[in-house]
Amino acid sequence: MTSPKLDRRQMLKLEAAAIAAAAAGLPVPALAANLATEREVSELKWDKAACRFCGTGCSVMVATKENRVVATHGDIKAEVNRGLNCVKGYFLSKIMYGHDRLTQPMLRKANGKYDKNGDFTPVSWTEAFDIMEVKWKEAMKKRGPNGVAMFGSGQWTIWEGYAASKLFKAGFRTNNIDPNARHCMASAVAGMMRTFGIDEPPGCYDDIEATDAFVLWGSNMAEMHPILWTRLTDRRLSAPHVRVAVLSTFEHRSFDLADIGMVFKPQTDLYLLNAIANHIIKTGRVNKDFVAAHTVFRRGQTDIGYGLRPEHPLQKKATGAAKANDSTDMSYDEYVKFVSEYTLEKAAEMSGVPLNRLEALAELYADPKTKVVSFWTMGFNQHTRGVWCNNLVYNIHLLTGKISSPGNSPFSLTGQPSACGTAREVGTFSHRLPADMVVTNKEHRTKAEHIWQLPEGTIPDKPGAHAVLQSRMLKDGLINAYWVQVNNNLQAGPNANEETYPGFRNPDNFIVVSDAYPSVTALAADLILPTAMWVEKEGAYGNAERRTQFWHQLVPAPGESKSDLWQLMEFSKRFKIEEVWPEELIAKKPEVRGKTLFDVLYKNGQVDKFPVSDIEQGYLNDESKAFGFYVHKGLFEEYASFGRGHGHDLAPFDAYHKERGLRWPVVNGQETRWRFREGSDPYVKQGTDVQFYGYPDGKARIFALPYEPAAESPDGEYPFWLSTGRVLEHWHSGTMTRRVPELYKAFPEAVCFMHPDDAQEAKIRRGDEVKVVSRRGFIRVRVETRGRDRPPRGLVFVPWFDESKLINKVTLDATDPISLQTDFKKCAVRIERVNVS
């Protein structure tokens, strides 16, 4: 693997990197130092960029020399990270320079022509688009618009996601486009929409320094959001009264700081949340004035199923599956009666958490003098009742009035750098449009069609195929042309053997993967398109606290690599309107006849109205040079017009290149820290104090939702729970981080974390190879009985970053029926020792 070309004189060891690396058990040789301070190096060109990894939204300073990134360090001007980076962030300068970086389009060929069983062969971009054009048109002729689909990403830049959504929803006229944020943030979206009628957190990171208590629900912030964890740790250690509660199905590094650590049985978080609400009511700590003025009560639909195939027995039994998102009015008294059965005593019995710890947790929320921030990530969201979990934690904050004020915040932390900015805000989900609009709402479609200058009826009125459904439809031959960008869904998607891989190799299907490296998904495709990464293109991300951040293109992409944005827009030139729109639609706007999708979607007088001369002097911009106008500015300003004036306001384009990000809504140049709060949020009417303006009545919803069991639980044949997740050193499927030598060496392969007593009982020793077996498949992996992750008896944890140990061959493709997000935290497995002969 290659590393940045800096000689010894050009590199000094970075103390902060050494500290962070030591915490992760990392060696930090001289070559790994990532902050240059000698005069020669400090004269390099430095510029800001958002970090390429998680949704925290750290800002970094990037040094370039001779068209190459040679160093990075934390941006001391950034409010989010204040000059710090986690260990992944310290090695950002190496993610683009793996030895197997893709630089040419590659098509499967045999005897000089495309063959699904052929070998990957370098081809030109023209030939790549030629075969794509043929396959797209064949699929649409055979099955109509829904014969094609796209799987995108929370790692798309804002304009990449926006351009992709336009191409599919307006151009090809299919809503079969979904981001991999379906696997990480869909439950958070649905939870916000159900409770508040509008998406994204009411608070911000400033709450960390203002609160009295942190409660982590299914969130290992110490490893998954380490920069926020440093801020949380600083608050805890500098203010003796502050308390930290951590809830998880197994112990992890965040427990090291916990004052109240709680390991609960999988799925019983539903019970715990209701029990806390009941405790608040029983002890007379409901903020009655707040509840009366700002909330109404709803009874949610129950027995909603598990998002499995319709013929699955669990789906057949689910009486409420068809109306999973429905709810009905109820009174406060009826809600009180509903939660009364959820006592702390029963919760302790159900969950396995000691009663005294549950009482201490409940008191943090109930005490009116204690400000509380609730953080959660995949433990809540990757859950067959993930939306319910989100609703139930909002219930607690609403009952106590602990919301939308400094130090009081329910906060879903984001996993990807722009799952908020691109997937949620742009609306790249199969049911969404920009600014919280949805395809099922005629007024919303009409507004989108007006902004996009399209005839009425262009955008389909039914949601398209979501992530898991796309895999099923590919397998069943109902989607025949498929484009994957910026994700690795063969490694990341559930039940890979039965539901994902078969669709990729279905002979009727043509699969395109745009990637920078030969991932598992890319190697299963028919055509691989080499993609520009990170600062090889101009970009924008939106982080978890509604902060939008921009960066300039700083270096060129290698070889023939092109950005995802260029690929989308260039491919759109291959389609005349007459080839993709019905005659009756064209008749409503005859001037589009003879034009290409590129002309109608991107050269429409709005996207192309900013000249190349608007690009800040001294910066590259390959896409704008190719198309002849400032693409990013035009796309952003058109997109921003969706949200301005109704609570999603973004600042003018040029403002973001000057700032370390701004938190929307941005009105009159001022960002918003606490939404729904008078004096902070410009959309709150004077004299209301708090206004949940997502709903017309200005009130939030408190939901009555019961405990319901998991889709699959351990039994005699499969006696263990399996949970999957991430580790500090690697990000998602490891496509980038496993190509950084220092990160690879720190955690080279996935292991199966197991309780030592379970291992001893099975005559398994630490380091032994075992099979992790489910009803769907198995992997072989070595056992770890010590270290950072400490499962209770009856549960094992296997991270999913390792492509040689595809744990998602084992997982179940059950989803939350409302959000359609996958539950990667709960399925049943057995552990078999591999006998070495």
UniProtKB/Swiss-Prot annotation:
GO terms for molecular function: 4 iron, 4 sulfur cluster binding; electron transfer activity; iron ion binding; molybdenum ion binding; molybdopterin cofactor binding; nitrate reductase (cytochrome) activity; nitrate reductase activity. Residues 44-100 form the 4Fe-4S Mo/W bis-MGD-type domain. CDD domains: MopB_CT_Nitrate-R-NapA-like, MopB_Nitrate-R-NapA-like. Pfam families: Molybdop_Fe4S4 (PF04879), Molybdopterin (PF00384), Molydop_binding (PF01568). Transmembrane segments: none annotated. [4Fe-4S] cluster binds at C51, C54, C58, C86. Substrate binds at W800. InterPro entries: Asp_de-COase-like_dom_sf (IPR009010), CT_Nitrate-R-NapA-like (IPR041957), MoPterin_dinucl-bd_dom (IPR006657), Mopterin_OxRdtase (IPR006656), Mopterin_OxRdtase_4Fe-4S_dom (IPR006963), MopterinOxRdtase_cofactor_BS (IPR027467), Periplasm_NO3_reductase_lsu (IPR010051), Prok_molybdopt-oxidoreductase (IPR050123). Its cofactor is [4Fe-4S] cluster; Mo-bis(molybdopterin guanine dinucleotide). Mo-bis(molybdopterin guanine dinucleotide) binds at residues 88, 155, 180, 184, 217-224, 248-252, 267-269, 378, 382, 488, 514-515, 537, 564, 724-733, 808, 825. Binds 1 [4Fe-4S] cluster. Binds 1 molybdenum-bis(molybdopterin guanine dinucleotide) (Mo-bis-MGD) cofactor per subunit. It comes from the Bacteria. It catalyses: 2 Fe(II)-[cytochrome] + nitrate + 2 H(+) = 2 Fe(III)-[cytochrome] + nitrite + H2O. SUPFAM superfamilies: ADC-like, Formate dehydrogenase/DMSO reductase, domains 1-3. Its EC number is 1.9.6.1. It is found in: Periplasm. Component of the periplasmic nitrate reductase NapAB complex composed of NapA and NapB. Belongs to the prokaryotic molybdopterin-containing oxidoreductase family. NasA/NapA/NarB subfamily. HAMAP family: Nitrate_reduct_NapA (MF_01630). Catalytic subunit of the periplasmic nitrate reductase complex NapAB. Receives electrons from NapB and catalyzes the reduction of nitrate to nitrite. NCBIfam families: NAPA, PRK13532.1. This is Periplasmic nitrate reductase. The lineage of its organism: Bacteria, Pseudomonadati, Pseudomonadota, Alphaproteobacteria, Hyphomicrobiales.
